Amino acid sequence: MIVTFEKTYLQKLYVDGKTKDKKHRFQPQIVSKYVKVVNLMKQQENVLGLTKFGSLHYEKLHGDKEGKSSVRVNDQYRIEFIEGMEAGKQIATICNITDLSNHYK
């Protein structure tokens, strides 16, 4: 699937492994797991491929986050993203990663 980043700090974390923004600093273990999960997302044909990895806990979100989906980075953090279909390719999914959030805040 094609993965895009809505916020620049998410792309910087993926590419560089760090960000200069003090608000979005994460522990090195979180960043490495984030990169690993994004790479796994890129390897899948579509979001249904994420369901075969139980540890990711793929789910569609409800309530105020209606329309978004998420996969777990670890017990505390998750990647929130919006799913979309690419014109011409029905099996390819474009995931726009919107946030790396603390699941319990």
Annotated model-derived regions:
Residues 1-38:
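Arg/Lys-rich, positively charged N-terminal/basic patches that mediate binding to nucleic acids
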Residues 17-20, 44-48:
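Short secondary-structure junctions and interdomain/linker hinges
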Residues 41:
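Conserved phosphate-interacting/catalytic interface
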Residues 68-105:
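Enriched for short, Lys/Arg-rich terminal
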